[in-house]
Each structure stands twice: as C-alpha cells, then as structure tokens.
C-alpha cells in the first residue's frame, strides 16, 4: 500500500531539514530557535542548501494545512491585530532584554489595560512566536520580539505594514466598487482608510513621520537579496551600448528616469567608465543630491536634471533606465510614462527596465510565490498597481506604441526582479 501524502511529506521534510542542519553544523552556524538569543535570519549559501531550505518550508506549510483541514484554515482570524497593537504601542521596547516584566507593569507603560495587553501578547506568542511567557503573568523576549526591540528598521517595517497597509486592506473592495477599478493611485483602499484624495507619495509630503517610516521600509525591502541595484549593475550588458550607440560622442548617454538620489546611476558609472549618466527626478527629490554622492571619480560622470516622467522627455539618449518606475503605476499611467519618452527617442534607443517579472503560478518556490502574491495585493491596496507577468509587459509596450520592441526579458540568477531590454524601432 502506498504511503499517504502526509507521511510522504513528513519524510521529505526530514530529508530536506537534515541537509540544512548539516550545513549549519559544518559551517558552525547557530541552529534556528525561538529563544531570545536565537538567530534572526538564515545565513546560508549554495544552491543545494537553499533549495532544501525552500523545500522544507513549502512541504511544512502543506503538511500543516493538510493536518488542519479546510474547515479550520478557511476560518478568518485576526492574525494581524496583535502585531498591529505591538507596533502601535511599541510593546517590544518595553520588555527588558534578558529579563521579564509583569503584564500589569507592561500595560502601564504601554497605556493599555492589563486585559488587552495580555490578550495581544498571548495571541502573538501562539501565532507568531513573538514574546514568550516564562512564568504565568510575566512576559519575556523571543528571538522575534528581541529583534523588534533592538532594530529600529524592523520596527519601521512592521509599523508600515501593520499600521498603514493592514487597515487599508479592509477598504480595498469598497474602493474597487466605489471607483470602478479605474487604476488611479489616489482611489484605493489606502485612500479610503486615510480619508485623503492624495496618492501616498503626495500624502507623505505633509506627514513626515510616515514618510520617514516608508523610506526606511523601502530601503530595507530594496536591499534584500535579489532586489538591490547590483542586479541591474551586474546583470545587464552595459558594454553593448558602445557597439550600438546612437550618440554623436564616444561616451554613450544613459538617462536614469525617476532615478531618485542617484545611487544606482553612480554604481553604474563606477562599474562602467565608458558611460555618462543623467539622473532625472522631481525637484524635491534631486535637490542637493549630487553634493551628497560619494567623492569618487565616477561622480563626475553623473549629472542631475529636474524632470517629471509624465512630461515629454527632452533629452535624446542611448538608453533610458526605468528602475522600479512602473511598479507603482497601473497600465493606463504606465502607458503615459512610456509615451512621454517618445519625443526624444532615436531609432535604436533602449529602455532598460528593472522591475518585477511575475512568473506563471508554480514556477517559484512556495515562499517566493507567497511573497509575490502579497506584494501584488499590497500594490492594489496602496496605488492600484500590480505585478506584471511577461505577457502583461509585452502588452503594455504595444499599447503605448507598436514601435517599442521587447528584445529581451529575463531574471538574473539569484534575483527576484528582472531586466527588460526594449528597443525603439521608430
């Protein structure tokens, strides 16, 4: 008789976990633990152990769901509420490291009742392994809560997602009904929750604390493995611009559209001395940016120009970088951005797009696909955008102008974002 699925899963979980455990032992790395001094992340390298790690996570998730059964896992639970309370009331920083505190004392410091403090913390303990209760009535740290207590960036990340995104999710379907799913960034669940007609980035200009928290969260997310600018700097054949330059000079010009403070442009200029970079962004974004670039020789080949990417492009160039530009915009607005480039495009000019290329379901590991689907719903909730698949990207460029030709589209090994090379054939 063939083994049942749950026994098969348990066996495969054991096999993959053994590979991860052997790697940790061989490299004298700490074993995962919920304890206060447990490691906060996996520092694993190598394709085999990474694959085993992802497999163990996916198989464990499936086994957990099978053992629960659909009648249980379909029940809605207030899964984010306890973390939202922990974030809003900064509970983690009020629990002593390598110590404990009574619920009564903790409640007093947090400005909550003892009953609510106890219920939020105990939910977080059993559902998220955030905090522990070493003896009845007393709270101490777990690895996760200690991370929150000691790392202000992680507190920013939790606060952004739980205090800004989480309550907006409940308003998203209402926004779709109310605004007829029109794709505008100021007609979202986020807008209904915050009671504003401003898009998030406009709202942040008058809410500096939220703006700082958002910037901190985005910096954290961007620098995660596979999302840093290294993917673009190292993953694109920049030297090919020399062979196909449309410029009248010997140094190809690359315009970084929406290039923020010039970090990515400087990295490209440093890695490729043959290129000249021009960073374009809104005046408030680029003000003083060049003076803040590191004093290295490549800095002389990075210039800045105030420009709104919805306005007609004024600078003819060999290539235009659009890194994380389309990610925040619906198709109708992404088409506007592309059409604004057309006035300055010369035959053979390239668009180098660095953004998500969502694969079809089942290609990614379960953990990575879950993260992708999370981001897709977050983009809907915050700005009416979405994560585009290959066919979506091709359709977008065709809708903007049939003279755009998608020459290549790929995701570099180890990256979570892809690179599209689009040629202007006008």
Swiss-Prot record:
Active site: 327
Gene3D superfamilies from the UniProt entry: Vaccinia Virus protein VP39, Winged helix-like DNA-binding domain superfamily/Winged helix DNA-binding domain
Top EC group: transferase
InterPro entries assigned: COMT-like, O_MeTrfase_dom, SAM-dependent_MTases_sf, WH-like_DNA-bd_sf, WH_DNA-bd_sf
EC annotation from Swiss-Prot or TrEMBL: 2.1.1.-
Superkingdom, taxonomy of origin: Eukaryota
PROSITE patterns, per the entry: SAM_OMT_II
Transmembrane regions listed in the UniProt entry: none
Function: The subsequent chain release by Dieckmann condensation (DKC) could be catalyzed by the TE domain present at the C-terminus of pyvA and/or the alpha/beta hydrolase pyvD, installing the tetramic acid moiety.
Organism, scientific name: Aspergillus violaceofuscus (strain CBS 115571)
Protein name per Swiss-Prot or TrEMBL: O-methyltransferase pyvH
GO BP, one annotated term: methylation
UniProt GO molecular function: O-methyltransferase activity
């Amino acid at each position: 008789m063939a083994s049942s699925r749950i026994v098969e899963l348990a066996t495969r979980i054991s096999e993959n976990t053994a590979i991860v455990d052997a790697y940790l032992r061989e490299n004298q790395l700490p074993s995962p633990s919920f304890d206060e001094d447990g490691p906060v992340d996996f520092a694993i390298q190598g394709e085999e152990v990474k694959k085993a790690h992802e497999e163990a996570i996916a198989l464990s998730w499936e086994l957990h769901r099978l053992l629960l059964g659909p009648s249980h896992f379909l029940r809605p639970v207030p899964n984010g509420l306890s973390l939202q309370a922990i974030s809003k009331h900064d509970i983690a920083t009020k629990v002593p490291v390598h110590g404990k505190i009574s619920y009564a004392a903790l409640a007093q410091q947090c400005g909550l009742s003892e009953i609510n403090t106890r219920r939020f913390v105990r939910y977080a303990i059993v559902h998220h392994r955030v905090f522990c209760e070493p003896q009845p009535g007393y709270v101490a740290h777990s690895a996760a809560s200690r991370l929150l207590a000691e790392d202000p960036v992680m507190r920013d990340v939790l606060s952004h997602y739980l205090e800004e995104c989480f309550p907006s999710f409940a308003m998203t379907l209402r926004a779709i009904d109310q605004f007829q799913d029109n794709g505008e960034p100021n007609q979202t669940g986020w807008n209904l929750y915050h009671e504003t007609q401003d898009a998030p980035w406009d709202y942040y200009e008058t809410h500096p604390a939220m703006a700082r928290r958002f910037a901190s969260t985005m910096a954290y997310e961007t620098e995660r493995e596979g999302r840093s600018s290294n993917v673009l700097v190292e993953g694109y054949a920049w030297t090919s611009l020399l062979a196909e330059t449309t410029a009248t000079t010997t140094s190809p010009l690359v315009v970084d559209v929406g290039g923020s403070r010039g970090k990515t442009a400087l990295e490209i200029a440093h890695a490729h001395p043959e290129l000249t970079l021009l960073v374009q962004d809104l005046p408030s974004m680029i003000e003083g940016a060049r003076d803040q670039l590191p004093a290295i020789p490549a800095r002389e080949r990075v210039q800045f120009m105030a420009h709104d990417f919805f306005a007609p492009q004024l600078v003819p160039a060999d290539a235009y970088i659009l890194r994380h530009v389309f990610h925040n915009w619906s198709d109708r607005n992404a088409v506007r951005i592309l059409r604004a480039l057309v006035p300055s495009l010369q035959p053979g000019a390239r668009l180098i797009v660095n953004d998500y290329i969502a694969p079809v379901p089942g290609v990614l590991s379960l953990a990575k696909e879950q993260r992708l689907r999370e981001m897709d719903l977050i983009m809907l909730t915050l700005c009416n955008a979405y994560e585009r698949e290959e066919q979506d990207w091709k359709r977008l460029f065709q809708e903007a102008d049939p003279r755009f030709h998608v020459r290549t589209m790929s995701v570099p090994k180890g990256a979570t974002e892809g690179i599209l090379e689009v040629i202007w054939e006008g």
